[in-house]
Amino acid sequence: MDQAKGKVCVTGASGFLASWLVKRLLLEGYEVIGTVRDPGNEKKLAHLWKLEGAKERLRLVKADLMEEGSFDNAIMGCQGVFHTASPVLKPTSNPEEEILRPAIEGTLNVLRSCRKNPSLKRVVLTSSSSTVRIRDDFDPKIPLDESIWTSVELCKRFQVWYALSKTLAEQAAWKFSEENGIDLVTVLPSFLVGPSLPPDLCSTASDVLGLLKGETEKFQWHGQMGYVHIDDVARTHIVVFEHEAAQGRYICSSNVISLEELVSFLSARYPSLPIPKRFEKLNRLHYDFDTSKIQSLGLKFKSLEEMFDDCIASLVEQGYLSTVLP
């Protein structure tokens, strides 16, 4: 990539990960065009305007994932596009129409706008490690790498709609990019933990808050899970954009641990919090991730301690938790 910092677009800029990515890009000296549903919503976007460099180098524009052409203006003239936006998942009786189609079409609509932009150098798509790990035929002793894809049939059978939507959307993105000569790189983060910039907690941050308050409902399904600091994921997006040799998929995950190990760690580190002690044992295959590909580009992952220390400090600052004593 050109060493001079240029203009880039971040879709869904007000989201949990996207906000942190915008923060990182501004600190790196990029001019950032962020797409949002409603640029006039001052309350929802105030956290973006507070970022260092925002007044000089951030512009927010309206775009709708389900409207073809609505990203044209935001993307035109940008050297890079970071597509982090994805449809909001809600309980549904029609996952095909309300989860799968929006995820695929939303991604393709962004790529259709990218195709029209002669300045484009690279698109970085936020996918998910769930596009790799949902299989029933892998060897638990061999870490999962980027060559592996989640089983579509397994997702449908067990109604794992989020993983299926991410898998189908990423596969559609690869097909479209190959057919249209778009330089695409995908980032596959595991479960994000860390400070939250938006005023309202996303489902991920809300799940962590629930666990720290003693709730078991959301985390009981985690079983074996990869965790990663939000800053590592944002930095990964920038690293794979800037490294000319970067190509293909990049798993982005620090620790893969069991739920029992997680709550044991949390209870020991934050004894003043009512961390649940017991969860129902899930019969799931052990797995680990091979992250040598992204580490070969120089990325070093933050520790589990840093993830949760930063997350808890943010939750305290925002008033979701009272002061946590070590």
Curated annotation (Swiss-Prot):
- CDD domains hit by this protein: FR_SDR_e
> Upon deletion of the gene, what happens?
Male sterility due to distorted pollen grains lacking reticulate exine pattern.
**Chief subcellular site?**
cytoplasm
**Per UniProt, what is one GO molecular function of this protein?**
oxidoreductase activity
Give the E.C. number(s).
1.1.1.-
Instruction: Please name one Pfam family that this protein belongs to.
Output: Epimerase
Which top EC class is named for this enzyme in its record?
oxidoreductase
What job does the chain carry out?
Involved in the biosynthesis of hydroxylated tetraketide compounds that serve as sporopollenin precursors (the main constituents of exine). Is essential for pollen wall development. Acts on tetraketide alpha-pyrones and reduces the carbonyl function on the tetraketide alkyl chain to a secondary alcohol function.
Q: Which family does it belong to?
A: Belongs to the NAD(P)-dependent epimerase/dehydratase family. Dihydroflavonol-4-reductase subfamily.
Name it: Tetraketide alpha-pyrone reductase 1
